[in-house]
């Protein structure tokens, strides 16, 4: 197509990578040996390109032997010709960095690959004088190939499900208009497994490509929403599967500013083998000091105006703390859950908004909605949620209705399962 007059110029971008590109498609030709090659690479650190080339040489020798023995030259050469015709345009036109993340291009040569391996399996089976034994060997070889395909598809499906869950959460979060503009933090755009079924094929799933953004994803699914994504590494956990996140990387000051210009803040987290998107709160700036008495007053620096708790659809407790700040506070927030016997059964300490807006960064007039989550609790009900602030000198005084709280831990809400 590129050579047709008036259509476009032909760019041979892949010529500089022709060795790697050819080896990539040779890997496709010998793909049933891919799991074995990958195991050798992982266990002994051999070079995958070299192993693919060695495997191709072995397959070629076996193929020639079987073709000579069975007089199948026409079918063998037809399969190889189809493979070459399907692979050659990509070999000369695309860089290796593109091929490596695009195993779908192997489908261009798939008819030739299947033809070659059908002849190889049939040829090996025909070496046995016992017809039933030959059929059993043929079925075993074909079944091994199908099994490796199933493993590959299973891993791809696992990656897709892991990302699909968090994107379903995203669409649910974006559905109500009152949530926008939305701030989405650490949203994984792509997921790749560090383990490989086939040596030279990267197993990955991409939900938002580099040329798009979270707002466009929402728009094509439910309609336009004002949404923006960012990356904040201090609350980004490392996982076995490597993922890329949407948005620009921000520091502490940047993430606070990012939160203040959006109505709701949502944080993507990895928890118990899955990614989830949680609403973690909001920050309003330059608000007036409330005239009503605070639920909890921590010596004038910060106060809790209200607190509530309810069960989320996923079974976790969703604890909401509404703070008002008179200025930055030298300290950290603790949130403890105690049972009827005053035993500690859970804690969700740390900065507000999922760990992104610490109390020492609060400014006068900030109204912070701090949403935290905790799973199932064990112990005697009811459970009490206690909140306090501490620093190197100890806990800050906590006052409720003019009375200082025992241990400076204010019981703000009760949980009953």
Task: Go through the PLM ranges and name each one.
Residues 1-225, 240, 247, 261, ...:
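Polytopic membrane enzymes that build or remodel cell-surface glycoconjugates and lipids
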Residues 172-182, 186-417:
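C-terminal luminal/periplasmic domains and tails of membrane-associated envelope-modifying transferases
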